[in-house]
């Protein structure tokens, strides 16, 4: 009995703290015809039944007594309407009264199915479609406040700012505010700082009235280094062995977007000279990044970011000095901290008292002296390293942070880099490479340190018996292609792992003058391809050779080359001298899309973001089997749902989603956007996206909602699929699983339809190739696998295909 009263008392106290309220969402609208059997109306509250005095139900303001198809359950908190008909429509209300006479009430509107607009049933009561409550924008930009609602027309709208009425074409701010009574959006152009405030829209129709409040924050355009803050600078974290630790760090970021890095300082003894030096390691630490509500933004603006770094199952090697670093090209800020064992807690934070712990102090004085010397030395080394990094950043005028920007699982291999003259820095870099490591995809080769005679590079990699082969098992045939740092050969392989006998393969290797970053990319690509696994629609890893002085990657060979060239060679151009090797049908084109969608669905299930889905990165194998290439450098997102690109380089602009273009945020949903562009390429037989549109105009057009028109010979279903992939809000785009279902249905419809009766594709104008804009470490994409030949064809884009990130930002400012 006493325990029961304790429970009631606790529940009563919780109600007193949080207030009497319903446990389900508030008022909502129901339509007859949605369910053929019954409807449940829920008025459950956060209060024990013993403390509820009564519950009153009404129908159209009349108390519900005994009705044949209406029953109450759970002490009257739920109402069930069974086999309801049109006379059951109307407004239902419930009022819950507690023992202390406090009460709450809510309403439910059941609308008859006969209230329609055309042939489509509509909601009569008003409901806001977009519930965004915070908008952040930069001065001089344009801002649209969206109050679009669902409900019966006509809908009247009233706008209020800071309790002051805004009239249509108002002179509140020199006619910068504009809206139409029939257009439920308020537009503000040429934003000023005084445009910030609380905006309220009030919507009303004959069925009721609702309001929606939005907070608008306006910031000046800032170019500054990021600011790192935490609860306590130079904080010390005390933990025991086996415990987990989370280190929270807060960053205020301005333009350009910052890069994040966690560094660990430790001592390392040279096996040759027995000399001990301080070393700096970039940590593969798992983390979670959150953009705080205060800093959410629509364009380029100030951002308030929280990063939680996770140290799991603390061991001896985790204790020591750490420094978090956030920076951009304008500078950097750091947050140093220590992780120590709890046995040092009293002696470090609270100096020992002479009377009570003098004995303990004497016993540990020697140990503490050693620790003090080590810690002091580490801090001195850390300061020196920070100075060196700062000096390099100043000289190069570019951020050189090698941002992990993803989560890591466990180091598999260690690359020890000995870059020659260590006296200049006094630091040996040790970089861990793991199965989920994915390094830079885009880079400028001129900014990388080349490995030459003065910079010897020692590489130690443990062989993996499941993949390792000897060079004697490979016999190269001819050069398929090469880029700035790598080559790909066609070869004959014997007795590869899990495959006996002889087969034709592609072998990738680095050039002699490759740089440090290329080597890291190469190793990480191997590990990613190992960890992802095999699928029929991706380019699969077959073997690796790493123990005979050089690194080689052996992958499947696709003799038809990349999909873009394959489609161009087989497009139905009506010319006398045209030679078409294969007649492409509508069934084939749909099958190509379906195969790529299946491959991408597999990569998405492995939490991998490709970031460059395009026809040039899809290879065509035997039987016209589609294989997605260049996913070895895709980003792994096992612990978070997005990846923010933080390095400079050339970008495939025309294939990038809006959020990737303007915020450099990549998700599986941004891959969906790129897949829509790929589908457009396939339907147009390798056409160039956004034909005739200059890149400097493309950004503005995309922000205004422009999408490519339906191309020639494209079905309605396929074009609808493309438009769904190009929706501005990422969450509104379909998943790859949904795309597979749609494409399988289209494939059935196209099983007997060919392109015989379709109009021919006009030849494109000759494209002038520029310097390689996309020379990534993976050379297995684009034109390296040539059809029936081994001619050299260096990777390159047309001028329209790629832009640097600086170009994107400048274009964004020009149209903002």
Curated annotation (Swiss-Prot):
Chief location category: membrane
Annotated Gene Ontology cellular component terms: plasma membrane; receptor complex
This enzyme's EC code(s): 2.7.10.1
Role this protein plays: Receptor for basic fibroblast growth factor.
Catalytic center residues: 612 (proton acceptor)
Glycosylation sites: 21, 69, 119, 156, 171, 244, 274, 313, 321
Endpoints of the signal sequence: 1-19
Name of the protein this chain belongs to: Fibroblast growth factor receptor
Xref: Gene3D superfamilies: Immunoglobulins, Phosphorylase Kinase, domain 1, Transferase(Phosphotransferase) domain 1
GO molecular function: ATP binding; fibroblast growth factor receptor activity
Modified residues (Phosphotyrosine): 643
Annotated source species: Hydra vulgaris
Keyword terms, alphabetized: ATP-binding, Disulfide bond, Glycoprotein, Immunoglobulin domain, Kinase, Membrane, Nucleotide-binding, Phosphoprotein, Receptor, Repeat, Signal, Transferase, Transmembrane, Transmembrane helix, Tyrosine-protein kinase
Places the protein is found: Membrane
Cytoplasmic-side positions: 392-816
Top-rank lineage group of the source organism: Eukaryota
UniProt catalytic activity: L-tyrosyl-[protein] + ATP = O-phospho-L-tyrosyl-[protein] + ADP + H(+)
Pfam families in UniProt: I-set (PF07679), PK_Tyr_Ser-Thr (PF07714)
């Amino acid at each position: 009995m006493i325990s029961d009263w304790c429970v009631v008392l606790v529940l009563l106290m919780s109600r007193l703290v949080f207030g009497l309220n319903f446990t389900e969402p508030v008022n909502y609208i129901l339509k007859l015809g949605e369910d053929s059997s019954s409807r449940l109306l829920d008025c459950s509250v956060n209060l024990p039944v013993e403390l509820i005095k009564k519950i009153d139900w009404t129908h159209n303001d009349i108390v519900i007594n005994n009705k044949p198809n209406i029953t109450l359950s759970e002490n009257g908190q739920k109402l069930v309407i069974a086999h309801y008909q049109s006379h059951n429509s109307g407004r239902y209300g419930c009022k819950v009264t507690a023992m202390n006479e406090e009460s709450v009430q809510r309403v439910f509107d059941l609308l008859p199915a006969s209230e329609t607009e055309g042939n489509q049933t509509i909601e009569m009561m008003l409901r806001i479609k977009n519930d965004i409550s915070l908008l952040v924008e930069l001065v001089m930009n344009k801002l649209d406040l969206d109050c679009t609602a669902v409900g019966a027309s006509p809908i009247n709208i009233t706008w209020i700012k800071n309790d002051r009425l805004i009239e249509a074409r108002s002179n509140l701010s020199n006619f910068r505010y504009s809206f139409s009574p029939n257009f439920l959006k308020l537009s503000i152009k040429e934003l000023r700082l005084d445009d910030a405030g609380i905006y309220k829209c009030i919507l009303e129709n004959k069925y009721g009235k609702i309001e929606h409040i939005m907070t608008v924050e306006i910031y000046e355009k800032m170019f500054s280094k990021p600011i790192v803050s935490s609860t306590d600078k130079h904080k010390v974290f005390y933990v025991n062995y086996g415990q987990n630790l989370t280190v929270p760090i807060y960053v205020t970021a301005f333009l350009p977007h910052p890069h994040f890095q966690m560094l660990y300082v430790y001592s390392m003894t040279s096996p040759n000279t027995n000399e001990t030096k301080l070393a700096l390691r970039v940590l593969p630490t798992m983390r979670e990044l959150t953009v705080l509500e205060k800093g959410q933004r629509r364009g380029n603006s100030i951002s308030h970011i929280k990063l939680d770094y996770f140290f799991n199952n603390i061991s001896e090697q985790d204790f020591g000095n750490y420094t978090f670093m956030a920076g951009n090209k304008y500078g950097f800020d750091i947050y140093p901290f220590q992780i120590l064992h709890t046995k040092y807690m009293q002696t470090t934070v609270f100096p020992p008292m002479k009377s009570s712990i003098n004995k303990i102090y004497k016993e540990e004085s020697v140990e503490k002296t050693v620790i003090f010397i080590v810690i002091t030395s580490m801090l001195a080394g850390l300061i020196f390293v920070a100075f060196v990094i700062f000096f390099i950043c100043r000289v190069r005028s570019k951020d050189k942070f090698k941002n992990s920007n993803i989560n890591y699982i466990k180091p598999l291999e260690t690359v020890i880099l000995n870059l020659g003259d260590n006296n200049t820095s006094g630091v040996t870099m040790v970089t861990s490479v793991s199965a989920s490591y994915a390094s830079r995809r885009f880079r400028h080769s001129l900014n990388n340190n080349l490995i030459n005679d003065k910079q010897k590079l020692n590489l130690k990699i443990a062989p993996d018996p499941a993949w390792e082969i000897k060079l004697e098992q490979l016999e190269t045939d001819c050069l398929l292609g090469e880029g700035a740092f790598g080559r790909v050969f066609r070869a004959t392989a014997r007795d590869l792992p899990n495959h006996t006998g002889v087969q034709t393969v592609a072998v990738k290797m680095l050039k002699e003058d490759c740089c440090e970053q290329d080597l890291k990319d190469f190793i990480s690509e191997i590990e990613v391809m190992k960890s992802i696994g095999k699928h029929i629609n991706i380019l699969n890893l077959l073997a690796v050779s790493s123990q005979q002085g050089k690194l080689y990657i052996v992958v499947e060979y696709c003799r038809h080359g990349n999909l873009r060239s394959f489609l161009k060679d087989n497009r139905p151009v009506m010319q006398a001298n045209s030679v078409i090797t294969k007649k492409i049908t509508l069934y084939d084109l749909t099958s190509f899309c379906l195969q790529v969608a299946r491959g991408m669905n597999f990569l998405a299930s492995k939490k991998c973001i490709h970031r460059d889905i395009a026809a040039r990165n899809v290879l065509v194998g035997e039987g016209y089997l589609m294989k997605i290439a260049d996913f070895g450098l895709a980003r792994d997102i096992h612990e978070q749902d997005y990846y923010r690109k933080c390095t400079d380089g050339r970008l495939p602009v025309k294939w990038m989603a809006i959020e990737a273009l303007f915020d450099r945020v990549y998700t599986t949903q941004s891959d969906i956007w790129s897949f829509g562009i790929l589908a457009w390429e396939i339907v147009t037989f390798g056409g160039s996206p956004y034909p005739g549109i200059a890149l400097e105009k493309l950004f503005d057009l995309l922000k205004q909602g422009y999408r490519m028109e339906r191309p020639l010979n494209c079905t309605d279903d396929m074009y609808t699929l493309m438009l769904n992939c190009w929706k501005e809000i990422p969450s509104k785009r379909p998943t790859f699983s949904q795309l597979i279902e749609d494409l399988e249905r289209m494939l059935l419809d196209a099983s007997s339809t060919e392109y015989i009766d379709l109009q021919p594709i006009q030849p494109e104008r000759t494209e002038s190739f520029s310097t390689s804009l996309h020379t990534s470490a993976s050379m297995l994409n684009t034109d390296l696998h040539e059809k029936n030949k081994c001619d050299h064809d260096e990777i390159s884009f047309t001028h329209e295909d790629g832009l640097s990130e600086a170009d994107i930002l400048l274009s964004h400012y020009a149209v903002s």
